[in-house]
Amino acid sequence: VILIRIDYNDRMITKPQKEALVAAAKEVLQNEFALKNNSNYSAAVLTKAGNIYAAVSYFSDTYTLTVHGEQAALIHAAAHGEGEILAIAVAASKEDKKSGEFINPCHLCKQLLYESSRRSGIETLIILSNNLGETKEVLFGEMVSYPWPE
């Protein structure tokens, strides 16, 4: 599979778009359906069409049916007919995490992001945010060295 490596410095995704993406992920964070009040997760995706779709995690009592924020954001975009994802912002509010620590997508979400990128041919930019208002940008290929299936 060949993914299109977008030059993100070439203003394919502008700074205001990145800021809006992170803001959207953080804005919906308060709406998460959590079992406990000590952890909240959300995400927002930016599509090739320029639209932003945000979503929160939806925790199930059994945990096996839990939908993660990243999964829900991808589904939200797909429900609107948009599967070409340029970037995803991940936000979290977790009391047991150190101040300033970034939350990475779990491996299930990384797999789903990989499959989304594989279908569209676009390598997704992942924007991690922390509770200090800082962000860290990582291309999907830098986060996952050996995706499956190749």
Model region roles, listed by residue range:
Residues 2-8:
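Short, positively charged and aromatic/hydrophobic N-terminal segments
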Residues 40-47:
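Short beta-strand scaffold segments in enzyme catalytic cores
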Residues 60-79:
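A short mixed-secondary-structure module that forms the rim of ligand-binding clefts
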Residues 55-63, 95-99:
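A short glycine/serine-rich beta->alpha loop
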Residues 13-31, 83-150:
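C-terminal binding/interaction regions
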Residues 51-52, 135:
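Hydrophobic "anchor" residues
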Residues 34-37:
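Short loop/turn motifs at secondary-structure junctions and domain boundaries
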